[in-house]
Structures are given as C-alpha cells and as structure tokens.
C-alpha cells in the first residue's frame, strides 16, 4: 500500500474526537505501520503488521479499535487484546486510555501475578476493551 499521500491522521478518515485525542497525546502524523494498518482495520479487515520497536504498532491497532467501538452499544467487553508480556499489556492499556478518552472507551488489564481482587473489580466495571 502506498502511504506517501497519507501524511496526516486527517486523511485516514478518523473522527474529530479521536483526532483531538491524538493531538493531545502528542501524535503529529502516522508512522508507516499506522498509515498502512489503520485504513483496512477501520473497515473490519484483519491486519498483520511487523515493525521495529518504537514505530507505533500499539497505536496502529488501538486507533481503529477505539474508532469502531465508538459507534457500538456499550455494556460489556467488545474487544479483546492479547499481549505476550505484562509490560506490553500495560503499555496497551495506557494507549487505550490516552486515545479512547473522547469516545469514553474504557479498558482494564488482566495479568498473572497481579492483585486478583483489583482485576475482578476492573471486570465488574464492564470495560469496552479487555487487555
């Protein structure tokens, strides 16, 4: 996919609310992995991406999830994100909190070795996304 014409998040077809959250979070323009992954993910297509650490892969999959969840009924987990490490799970949660603010997308994280009661409380809040 040629991403040369997609130099900013506005050209990706994102809502104004999400664009504002991106700006607030310090995102100025999509990285190559984001420019390639976001458009097909917004249409519901499965996406597989490979890029080096620090290239914005987490945002590349969180952005379309937040955008799609904004128009779906609330009240139960509507997305499940699996990560291979606790560190990546917490990073993903932080990204969701930053980019899902305007759409009021909530998330909780479940990881081994953490306080089980706190995690149960998080589940009882019926988050939109379970990491």
What are these regions (language model features)?
Residues 11, 16-27, 35, 74-131:
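Conserved nucleic-acid-binding Ia/Ib motif block in the N-terminal RecA-like helicase ATPase lobe
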């Amino acid at each position: 996919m040629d991403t040369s014409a997609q130099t900013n998040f506005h050209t990706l077809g994102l809502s104004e609310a999400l664009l504002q959250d991106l700006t607030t979070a310090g995102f100025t323009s999509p990285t190559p992995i984001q420019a390639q992954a976001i458009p097909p993910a917004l249409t519901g297509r499965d996406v597989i991406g490979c890029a080096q650490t620090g290239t914005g892969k987490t945002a590349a999959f969180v952005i379309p999830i937040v955008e799609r969840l904004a128009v779906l009924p609330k009240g139960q987990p509507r997305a499940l994100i699996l990560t291979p490490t606790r560190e990546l799970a917490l990073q993903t949660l932080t990204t969701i909190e930053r980019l899902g603010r305007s759409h009021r997308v909530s998330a909780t994280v479940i990881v081994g070795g953490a306080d089980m009661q706190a995690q149960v409380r998080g589940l009882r809040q019926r988050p939109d996304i379970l990491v």
